[in-house]
Structure formats: structure tokens, C-alpha cells
Swiss-Prot record:
Listed result of changing residue 36 to D: In colorectal cancer
Listed name of the protein: Mitotic checkpoint serine/threonine-protein kinase BUB1
Lineage, uppermost ranks: Eukaryota, Metazoa, Chordata, Craniata, Vertebrata
Span of domain BUB1 N-terminal: 11-182
Organism: Homo sapiens
Primary gene name: BUB1
Annotated active site: 917
Tissue: High expression in testis and thymus, less in colon, spleen, lung and small intestine. Expressed in fetal thymus, bone marrow, heart, liver, spleen and thymus. Expression is associated with cells/tissues with a high mitotic index.
Subcellular localization, as worded in the UniProt entry: Nucleus; Chromosome, Centromere, Kinetochore
EC number: 2.7.11.1
Regulation: Autophosphorylated when the cells enters mitosis.
Residue ranges of the region described as Necessary for kinetochore localization: 1-146
Amino acid sequence: MDTPENVLQMLEAHMQSYKGNDPLGEWERYIQWVEENFPENKEYLITLLEHLMKEFLDKKKYHNDPRFISYCLKFAEYNSDLHQFFEFLYNHGIGTLSSPLYIAWAGHLEAQGELQHASAVLQRGIQNQAEPREFLQQQYRLFQTRLTETHLPAQARTSEPLHNVQVLNQMITSKSNPGNNMACISKNQGSELSGVISSACDKESNMERRVITISKSEYSVHSSLASKVDVEQVVMYCKEKLIRGESEFSFEELRAQKYNQRRKHEQWVNEDRHYMKRKEANAFEEQLLKQKMDELHKKLHQVVETSHEDLPASQERSEVNPARMGPSVGSQQELRAPCLPVTYQQTPVNMEKNPREAPPVVPPLANAISAALVSPATSQSIAPPVPLKAQTVTDSMFAVASKDAGCVNKSTHEFKPQSGAEIKEGCETHKVANTSSFHTTPNTSLGMVQATPSKVQPSPTVHTKEALGFIMNMFQAPTLPDISDDKDEWQSLDQNEDAFEAQFQKNVRSSGAWGVNKIISSLSSAFHVFEDGNKENYGLPQPKNKPTGARTFGERSVSRLPSKPKEEVPHAEEFLDDSTVWGIRCNKTLAPSPKSPGDFTSAAQLASTPFHKLPVESVHILEDKENVVAKQCTQATLDSCEENMVVPSRDGKFSPIQEKSPKQALSSHMYSASLLRLSQPAAGGVLTCEAELGVEACRLTDTDAAIAEDPPDAIAGLQAEWMQMSSLGTVDAPNFIVGNPWDDKLIFKLLSGLSKPVSSYPNTFEWQCKLPAIKPKTEFQLGSKLVYVHHLLGEGAFAQVYEATQGDLNDAKNKQKFVLKVQKPANPWEFYIGTQLMERLKPSMQHMFMKFYSAHLFQNGSVLVGELYSYGTLLNAINLYKNTPEKVMPQGLVISFAMRMLYMIEQVHDCEIIHGDIKPDNFILGNGFLEQDDEDDLSAGLALIDLGQSIDMKLFPKGTIFTAKCETSGFQCVEMLSNKPWNYQIDYFGVAATVYCMLFGTYMKVKNEGGECKPEGLFRRLPHLDMWNEFFHVMLNIPDCHHLPSLDLLRQKLKKVFQQHYTNKIRALRNRLIVLLLECKRSRK
């Protein structure tokens, strides 16, 4: 009879001459022959399996072959250290795509009590998409079920086997019945992989336990039985570890101690592995970014050199940035005069002559402040004060007055500590005074002289550069009203501008809003541009450890009255990210609705109450960005974070325009000097948290833009020209009026009446369950996809946006990144608008708008899966220029982006859709902006996002108009504030406000002069002045809903200027912006 050794020699000789494609098949037949003919010769089988592994270890063809994996697992049954053996297989790539390997590995770890490690092994198999996948997922679910059942300590103790006893039993019975014993061992080990133990092994194991017992001594009670079968006596346990002095530990206590030590070690090992993987990924990505930045630097250097050689000197002078140059003092005085009404110019003189007669209403106002802050219900009943007719101004914030002319000099040397609530932002707190939008340049070298605020940009001295970074940002933080007994008297104005700047630099006192009250403001430095928390439009976050420097667009101080010093407002860490979004559709931070006065409660602590009763002649309308509607004497606020509402008495009307009576109507003279506050309230205005995450209201005061008058005849005749070239043509006369197009009931009715419901879309999935828990650094099942959530991009009150990945996390090339917009309650409207927009647009235009891949609707929320944009919003790009010498975006880029915006809105309107929420942080930059090389489309990569406020005009009768105010957006159009009907005008205004942000780095405020709306900061030193005057005149002065300007004609005029001046420069400007974006992205890692 042939022996196995002889057959093996024959096999080896055969394999040397074998030329087939499957050598493993020959080995398989030989091993089967050995198992059938020599079942008891286990030692030879182990040697044969070891020889087989060495033969095929380096052959990648068989690494995931089921036959080879099965032999590896069979060899593992005879291995003493299974965990090390499985790691050896995995590190050599054997079985990485095979489910049996992971199941066997996890089964061994589970038997050892290493449940967390076992779970990690199964998860790794699922991530690697091991086959068969269904079987692996089933075993993972069974493992989780067993895990929940073994949480009780008693169950954990009874379910864990005594491995030493099993080994001893096997050794005792090995000679008496070796065949059956080995079969039992094989079955037991197989049961660890499958979770099922055969009854035969149970029976034999029970019989063996009756033979061997555990004793405190090192010898078994039935030692004679062991001696008969010539088996060495094995010590069951170490007495030194259990018996210590007079006390004795139990096995459970010893096992628990070892388990805790092993668990801590495994946790440390896992953390170290995770850290190394993350470090390698970051290093790889940083290397790619560095290579790309080096290439861009080289291209930028080459383009700049060529552009400097071809640039005429005259052209350079015409394009000097307005923030960096300024006329002489004499020219400033000459330019200042036409900007102010006659009453304003006479006010300082009159106040100097009789300073104690100027503020006759100060005591009543001071009392009204205290009453309003302590008891809002009482303050609302106080009658309005006498209007300050002599102090009406056109300034964007307030006029400065004083009781004593000498107090200016006195305040220059005195610093009054702020006693109000401190706002903790970052590592330090700056305390400055809230100022007007006069560009007051602090220059402390001028000494103690009185001054008048300057209305134009001063010369770029060293002090000016310091002041620009200082003053520019003090309006960039929210106002928290505090109870105050401050009744300091007003400060007077003088004619010397420089002394006022010096006084402003050193003193923390400032007069109140509209020249009535004083406000103490503290400048916060720990959060960035337009930041109101992690908001859902996932702009690119700024680095957390940003060096101290010039403030950026959106930083604001906290304005309040002096109050008791113990009150403190906690700092919100979410404000360290500039991924902002305005206008979440379900935003509760809304102004009061006339239809539901019962929704409002009494005033709360965070309610921002007016510092004084504003006279009707002084303020026409005050609007806080996105959150606030101001009334004539009282203001209303909804705190969306706590859903606490603060409103005036229920008897009054809530709309600021509807509230006015005919007696309160402004005369034409006073109206021409009043201001429409379109994006920020006065210092006494209402403040709320814009993004539902804190008490921040992102509002700005224009401190850098010089105020100048337009030539009276500069834009004569433009009205007729633009109205004749309307892009939408003449709209039919409205035959249908809708109050609020964003009403939840109306939207539900519109969605219910669709001929093709949203639920019928192929990429819409409805789940009859609640929204799963979605957290960073976790994975969850979304339909048939296993999604891994990386981190939170932005967060609002009702929506969070996460960056997620589908696919292998370790495979950087094949993994697909996207965003998850999670909303509670569900919001199918935004998905409907996005889908309709893609259907109505031409395929070549779809890349300019955000695309949703799918929508998952749950019972209590929704998840929208959309395209990921990696380089932040246009708002972030605007802020990046704050740390550059020019401080604002270059003109070439502004015109390029403006042309792209006009084209986007034209396409949206052609689809009969109103976006409804145009603003800088709803334009986002993707990879296309870095990769595109088209000469004619250098603003490619810019996309429009956030369709939650959009309106589908096809669902309404033709010519429908709306009357509601866009209460969830700070960019309210002129028609809303003047109580006129509107439809497409809201997008026109949004584009104008966004372009203004790019030009000046501040929010736009509009004034009405003689019935014509103009941006408050105009543009005396701005290049292409005529073009921008015409642009803002067309976008802000739309007669009605029937005659809309032509966006295409306006875009062609911008294109003409662009081609004349910036064709040779735009690529260098774009490359520089790319470098800034890449550096910003790398710095936040």
C-alpha cells in the first residue's frame, strides 16, 4: 500500500513537469486522498498544509481563492496563536476579499473576549467588500445581537469557557480515543467560526468535566486516572496569582483584570494605527497641494512679469484700489460738503453755541431705556419722544453730539472701563467704541484737537493702515442689550477731523444710535468673516489658530449699554468656522407675522430692545440681516436657538410700514435724507442669532467705503433704455396676488398638487422609519449604500451638512465624496426645485448649479445627497483678501464673477424659477475653478447653491406677485422694505448686494434720495465709476413687476469693460486667488 510520503514524492515530481493553469487543483486532490485514506494521521496533515501554504504564499492569484482560504483556515485550527496567524495572512494580502477569513478571525477574538476587536475585524471586511457580502453582513448582525445579550455580568461570566480545562481534557482522552477526540476538536473550533456547537462535543465535554475538577491544590483529585494513561500533570492555575496572604481571588476577578489590561492595550494599538493612517493621508494630500501650489506660483510669476512689461503707466493709475489712496485734507473738505443736507452741516455749529439746548429729550430717553430693558411690556407703552429735527443725518449709523464741547478733549485722556457683560472670544477681549459709518481714521499724532468725522478716504499714512484694520471690524459682532444706568451726556462735534480720529482711537465712548445714546462695544477677534456658527452652506473653514491681524469681513463687536459686570455671555465654539449660510428655509428667526400675533411671547433676556424710541423722521425702516423687522418705536425678535420670541404688544401691527399712520408720513424733504437699512440695523436695532446657533447677528457697518454723491445727471435716461431691453420682456399684468410664497401650508399644497409627485422621482426614496443617527466619524446604511461620515461642514437650527464618502476609505482614488444635507423636519421642496432646475436647464448650463444625486425622506427628516464643493464660498474668497495689501477683491475678478452671476440668474429666470436667496455665501467654488483653462470662461467653477428659498413660478398663475418680506434673509429687496409687490426683483437686489460685497468687503446699505435708491457708499475713487453707477441704478431701481431690466444687456456692458482692461490680467488674478484658496484649505488641517 502506498504511504503518504511516497505519494508526496510522486506529487512533487509531477508538479515539476506540470504545465497546467491550476496547480492548486493537483494539491487539492492529493490532500483529499490523504484525508480519506489516513484520517488519523493528523501530524502529517499539518505538515502537508504547512507545505501547501509555503508553496502558494507568494502567488497572488490564489490569495482570495476559496480553496486556498479553506486550507489556510484548516491549518489555523492547529496553530497555537490564532490571532497572530490571522494577522500574518491579512498582512500578506491573503483572504482580504474573502468573508470566511474575517468570520473565523472575529470568531476567535469573540471567544477570547475581545469583542471590540472582533467588531473591528468584521467592519473591516465589510469595508473591503469581502465576498460573499450577504453572509458577512449576516454574521455581523448576529454578532451584534450576541453582543447586546452579553452585556449583563452574570451572562458574561457563565458564557466564557475555561480554556485550560478544555486543553487538559483533550490531553487526557487523546490516547484513549484519538480519532474521535480530534474530530471533536475540529468541531469545537469550527463552532467558534459559525457560532454553533455540536451536541456530540457538548456531551463529551460534559463527561470530561466530571473527570477533571478544579482544586486549590496543583494536583487533580483523580490523579491516579491520569497516571494510568501516562499523561503529564498540568497545573490548572497559578496559586501565586490567586492566593495573596490570607485572601484569595476568584478566577473571575483574575480574568477581569487580564481582560481590562488587554482591552487598554488594544485600544492604544487601535488609536495608534488610526493616527498613523490619518497622518499618512494628510501627508499625501499636503504633498499634492504643495506640488500644485508650486506650479501655480511659477505660472503666476511668469504671467505677472509679462503683464508688468505690457502695462501702460496711465492704465495702472486708473486702476489703483480706492482703499489705498486718498486726496489731501483740503480735497476731503471740498468733497464732504455736497454729501450732507443743510440741517446736518448746521448742527455742530448750533450745538457749540448752545450745547445744553441741543439734546432736550435725553432724560426721557434714558428713562425709557431702563424701562424697556427691565420690563419690555412697560416700555412698549411709552409714547414716542419728540423727533430730533435738527439732527437728521444721512450717515449710515448715527450722528455725534455733545453736551459740552470740552468733553471731547477730556475723553481723549480718559478711559472708562466697560462694566457690561464681557464677551469671551478666543484668548483676548478688545474693547472699543461703536462708531458710525464715517471713515474715521485714528491718528493719535495730531494731539488734543476737536474734529469732525470724515466722509471720504484719508491718505494712506501709517496710521491709516493701522486704522483700516481696526475700525473696519468693530461692527462685525452682535449686540446684546444689557441693563444700564448710563446717562452720560452727548459729545459735541467739531470741525477738525483728525482730532476726532485721535479721540476715537483712545476712547471707548461713543454716542448712541442716530445721535441719541452712547454705546459701549467690545471687539471680538476669535471668529471670522460673516460667521454665525457652522451653517449649512459649508463654506471653507478658516484656520482656528489664526494670527492676530486685520479683522475680516463679518467680524463684529458686541454693542451694548453698560450694565452690571457679572453678566457673561458664553462663547460658542461653532463661530470658529466661516462656513456660513443665510436663509435656512425653516429658520425660526423671523420677524413677526401679522397673521399670527398669538405666536409671540413676552420679552426675554436676549431680546434686543431699542436703546431709545426712534422718531419716525429719523428712521424709516430698520432691517437686521435675515432676522429682524424693526418697528417705529419698538422692535421684534425671534431667538431661533431657543425658539423664544420677543415682540411688542399684540395690539400693534407688526409691519414697520403698515404701522405708520398718515400723521407719521415723512415729507419729501425728510424722506430724501432718510436711509433704507437693507442689511443692518442701527446700534439700537434688534439683534438675533442669524444661524440659530448663538446670539450672533451678522451685520456690518460701512466704515471703509467713502460716501459721495452721484452726479445728478450721470444716469439720466437710463430708465427707458433698460426697461425697453427687459430680459423677461414685459410681464403680463398680475391677476393673482400671493402673500407669502414660503408658507409651509402653501408649499405642502403645491407639492401635493404636482402632476408628477416628488415621491415618484427615480432618485427619491421614502422610508417608513425615523431618520438614523448621523454623526461624524461613523458609518450608517443609507438605502443600499454604506456611507461613512467624515465631518460636519455646517450646521443650522434645522439642517446639518456633512461630508461623506461611499467606498473604500483606504482607496483614495476610487472613493466618492459627496455632501449630506440632513434636515428636520423633512424638506422635499428644495429637492423638487433642484430637480426641476436640472430638467429645465440645458445640459451645458447645469454645472453652474448644485446638483442633488438623491433624496431620502424619513418620517421625521430628510437627507439630500448632493455634489461636494471643496474650496469654500465666494464669501470666503472675499474674506481672504482682507489679509492682503489691497484688502478687497481686484476689479478684474469682481467683473468676471459679476458677469457669471448675471448669466446664472438669467438662466434661472428663463426656467421660471426665482432663487430668492442670492448672497455671497450661496455662491461656491469647486474643483472646476482650479482645473479650468478656458480663456473665455475664467470664472468657471462658480456654482449657485441653496434652493430652499426658491419659488417655482410655473406653479402659480402667470404674472403672480408677492407681498411678503423675505424674513429669513438679510438681503431684502427695495420692494419689500417699501411695501411694494415683487417677484423677480429679489434676485436682482441679491446680485447687486453680492457685487457690492466684492467691491468693498462690506454689506450694502441703500439710501433713498429723491425717490432713487443708491448704495450708501459710492464710489468716488472706484475704477470704472460710470459703469458701476449704471449697474447699481439698474439693479436697485426697478419700476414694477411688469418691467424688468435686461440682465443680458447689463452683462454685455460689463464684458466690454472687462475685455478693454483685464483680458491680459485676469489669469494672474485668478491664479493668485487659487493660491489663497489652497493655502487656506491647507492651514485648517
